[in-house]
């Protein structure tokens, strides 16, 4: 008689719970529950589950796109650890970041905000391309990323996670919730700690390959339900210290008496609330009041340049929704957003301000903008086969005046195997140039910032999706094309003057064409393969010349494989990526007669892999990142003289670290997410 072990029974039960049947054109398809699904409705995007995120280490939001063909995350420079997300070939300033469907990580939080969301706090993530709904504001130009945290109302229990890497990074995460009064009153605490103590200098340039980061992050969330009223709310606080610069041996290698150091200290406080009043459940009629506030304090020292910023943000939205009939939905609302930045930029006594740009001395650099607005959105939904969504916003900025935001989305599914989506719309944003790009302070160039206009762009997109029965499974094919055309834009000009970094207004054309195809198929109900290819054509006018955007790869090819054994005890994941080459900023000739850098960079490949072993109440995972060990050669230009004006750590297009291994454990006591 064969008796299945308890752990195997549990894993088999969990695996069976993820099985799902689909009936498609008289063909019955049995498959494991998808970890990445298309968004419902007219928007083009993906709903990414926790299982998909955990196919890699996923230490934070910035590391959660490893298996995603649409989104790139790159270092902004080689010293601070700042990262930016890219969607449709454009930087993260044009991607609206949301947490729990509330705008977040604006201004000074933008360069490091991807590290403020621990991976183990995330329950799911929604990534949409192109313009999003007008409900969330006017800012999403190229897409929207929304993070859903684990919930107080989830199954009661405690989750723990420990992680360590060969690069000297350690992380600990915990989240626990209790139901005080059934599921009508619940609370949850999430905690995170990380410490990277390594001083590794793998390329011998005298600088640490990665900043030392110590972060404490704590969040408390509540849910209360009574009758037709639902309340969600919470508070969070974060404290982070990051340091980088020359290692001890650098002075003996290159001379000098004072090591170049970067120190960035951050404190961040957030609060949010959601009040929902259900007026008529049968017709989906409800009123909701949503809001969040944040205080972001950052003190930074880049060599001898001091930059301090105190940023406050408040956002509120009053929303009314109703279904006139099952096919007709109306959403209307009011919104309010306020940004306040108090910035201080200074040099030590004796320094000549003009040697460092046009910003010194900036003793009281205040940027303040208040923007109330209103929107209306109509959606027609015919049995999910035809969905048309049209919305219009009107907003008034005390800085830029009144502006309109029209957006339209259409989904047409003429057959179960075929879906067409199209979209068109406009987006705006206010550039806080120094706060959003404060990593540029690490450069030795003079930093010049002009009086910037409000950014504005039109975005148009279309997509085709096929779900084709092949054998016992479905072959999923997708193709999409997006065009973004800027009417006004704040650009960072690396090209015109090799002694300057110039943030200025667009004077000419700027656009992005992005084309992507991807396919996925589940073999033997255990092995899931995905292949994707994306091509970007991004051009901007710099100094009167229409040039390809620098430090931007022209294409990306990705293949992912995920295999789970029949009993669900083992899982093997691998991701291979080929990143296309691109243009570097215009090089200059050094005093020795050499070029500062090559005019172009070549394509490079990366490989990530992870093995997970599941037990009844915990799992252990072991993996490696950048197993091809590709590193950008000399990511810091002028590393032998960091106090000179030729010191340039922002010429980064690829990895600055080599291969890395890691190990982690996830423990679930009572919870099943």
Set out the residue ranges of the language-model regions.
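N-terminal periplasmic "start-of-domain" segments of outer-membrane beta-barrel proteins
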Residues: 23-56, 84
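Extracytoplasmic beta-strand/coil segments of soluble accessory domains associated
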Residues: 62-103, 123
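Flexible loop and strand-edge segments within Gram-negative outer membrane beta-barrel domains
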Residues: 196-216, 225-287, 293-311
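Gram-negative outer-membrane beta-barrel transporters
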Residues: 381-384, 477, 481-485, 505-588, ...
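C-terminal beta-signal and adjacent terminal beta-strands/loops
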Residues: 529, 578-588, 612-673
